[in-house]
Amino acid sequence: TNRNFLRF
């Protein structure tokens, strides 16, 4: 899973 989406 991309942790980049956790920024939202």
Curated annotation (Swiss-Prot):
<comment type="similarity">
    <text>Belongs to the FARP (FMRFamide related peptide) family.</text>
</comment>
<dbReference type="GO" id="GO:0005576">
    <property type="term" value="C:extracellular region"/>
</dbReference>
<feature type="modified residue" description="Phenylalanine amide">
    <location>
        <position position="8"/>
    </location>
</feature>
<comment type="function">
    <text>Can act as a modulator of exoskeletal and cardiac neuromuscular junctions.</text>
</comment>
<keyword id="KW-0964">Secreted</keyword>
<keyword id="KW-0527">Neuropeptide</keyword>
<dbReference type="GO" id="GO:0007218">
    <property type="term" value="P:neuropeptide signaling pathway"/>
</dbReference>
<protein>
    <recommendedName>
        <fullName>FMRFamide-like neuropeptide 4</fullName>
    </recommendedName>
</protein>
<keyword id="KW-0027">Amidation</keyword>
